[in-house]
């Protein structure tokens, strides 16, 4: 919320827990109970002619409020962002938490081309972010890319590209999993 409004974090009162608790994120629309009303930065940039792109975690407001949707916040493109603050899975072998049985809010959406490929969610989101830049660059448009990796939020699941070197360095499995996730973001 602080990033989206320009306010100091402690001044927003944001707690993002449940809609009936005060305060739960921001709202781009006035009059929404228990939210911080403000015009979000992406909306201001969009209004100024920027092509606005969101990729990854979009945890600005509680489910069911206007601020829960990146589109309502002023983004033209949204890649896998919803109200969830964490993914159900970082692993493509687990379809990033998507199952055929039922919908799950924590399942990362719109990443089917990576299912079963062995690509960690962090890398998949990075690849998608790069793809979204093709349009504004090709058309000479100014752009704003808000890249918000889910890592290193729980569940702590290894980025297989990097974990072995941490195990070889003597880290326990938990530390190695976490370190591999950090390196995946830094890559």
Per-region residue spans from a language model:
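Active-site nucleophile/metal-coordination loop of metallo-enzymes that catalyze phosphate/sulfate
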Residues: 1-16
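Residue-level detector of short coil/turn "hinge" positions at structural boundaries
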Residues: 9-10, 52, 77, 173
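Formylglycine-dependent
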Residues: 15-51, 58-143, 149-158, 167
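Extended hydrophobic/aromatic segments used for targeting, binding, or gating
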Residues: 87-90, 161-185
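Short, well-ordered amphipathic alpha-helical segments that serve as non-catalytic structural scaffolds
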Residues: 128, 185-187
């Amino acid at each position: 919320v602080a990033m989206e409004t320009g306010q100091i974090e402690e001044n927003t009162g944001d707690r993002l827990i449940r809609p009936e608790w005060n305060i739960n994120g921001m709202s781009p629309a006035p009059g929404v109970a228990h939210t911080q009303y403000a015009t979000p930065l992406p909306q201001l940039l969009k209004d100024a002619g920027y092509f606005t792109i969101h990729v990854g975690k979009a945890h600005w407001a509680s489910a069911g409020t206007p601020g829960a949707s990146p589109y309502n916040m002023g983004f033209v493109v949204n890649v896998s962002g919803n109200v969830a603050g964490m993914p159900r899975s970082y692993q493509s072998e687990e379809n990033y938490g998507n199952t055929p049985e039922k919908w799950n809010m924590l399942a990362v959406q719109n990443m089917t081309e990576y299912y079963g490929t062995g690509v960690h969610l962090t890398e998949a989101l990075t690849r998608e972010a790069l793809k979204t830049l093709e349009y504004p660059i090709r058309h000479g448009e100014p752009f704003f890319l808000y890249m918000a990796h889910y890592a290193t939020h729980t569940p702590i699941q290894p980025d297989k590209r990097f974990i072995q070197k941490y195990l070889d360095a003597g880290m326990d499995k938990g530390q190695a999993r976490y370190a591999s996730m950090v390196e995946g973001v830094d890559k």
